Amino acid sequence: MAKVTVKLFANLREQAGKTNIEIDGNDLREVLNSLIEKYNGLGELIFNNEEFHPFIHVLVNGISVKDKDGLDTMLSTGDEIALFPPVSGG
């Protein structure tokens, strides 16, 4: 099982109360399921049913999971997952 770091930004960070979380998992789905079990309320911010919310960006080692295998993206120890919710500004 891989030990990875999940980096949370904006309202995801506020909901969890942490910026960086170390968690174990073999693929992205497993890591995110563990994350939302530990931190109440994150699931609604990340997922719409069983898919990512349309505007959330998920990167593994700086590469969008849309360019990989989505939730089935395999992970290795030391990988970094970044979760970016929609952000607006002016």
For the regions a language model picked out, list residue spans one by one:
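Ubiquitin-like/PB1-type beta-grasp interaction modules and other compact soluble beta-rich domains
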Residues: 1-89
